[in-house]
């Protein structure tokens, strides 16, 4: 299946000069969504994953069903201030300024094997911050999975040296 054909391109969003890759059209397509989850499941079914960590918010969309299919737990990595118990926090750089991600301190058991999932990798800043959170919890980052990679932005070079699965490259 050609997943790229199911991803809408929106020019000049969220600002002029940006070509936004909109996955809502992929999500609306029953066959496309099923194919996406099935491809990710096949890629990691032999990895003994304990937890799938989804990055807010679109990482939740793919992470939860993937965790279910892999027989793993799902762990949300949230923007600051959204979790109710004790958290680990990591600050990371944005194009202009910084942001913070958080995870519950008790989300992952020591040595737990973790797969981080998000919809897209661009510069890699958010995904790298998520890896730091996994380490703070005592987890073992096994791999990353992204639906889309924007290759020109070089995000891979900012990530830990673990396997990366990408379904669509631009």
Curated annotation (Swiss-Prot):
GO terms for cellular component: cytoplasm. GO terms for biological process: adenine salvage; AMP salvage; purine ribonucleoside salvage. Pathway: Purine metabolism; AMP biosynthesis via salvage pathway; AMP from adenine: step 1/1. Its main location: cytoplasm. It catalyses: AMP + diphosphate = 5-phospho-alpha-D-ribose 1-diphosphate + adenine. InterPro entries: Ade_phspho_trans, PRibTrfase_dom, PRTase-like, UPRTase/APRTase. GO terms for molecular function: adenine binding; adenine phosphoribosyltransferase activity; AMP binding. It is found in: Cytoplasm. Keywords: Cytoplasm, Glycosyltransferase, Purine salvage, Transferase. The keyword Glycosyltransferase applies. Signal peptide: none annotated. Its EC number is 2.4.2.7. It comes from the Bacteria. The keyword Transferase applies. Catalyzes a salvage reaction resulting in the formation of AMP, that is energically less costly than de novo synthesis. HAMAP family: Aden_phosphoribosyltr. Belongs to the purine/pyrimidine phosphoribosyltransferase family. Homodimer. This is Adenine phosphoribosyltransferase.
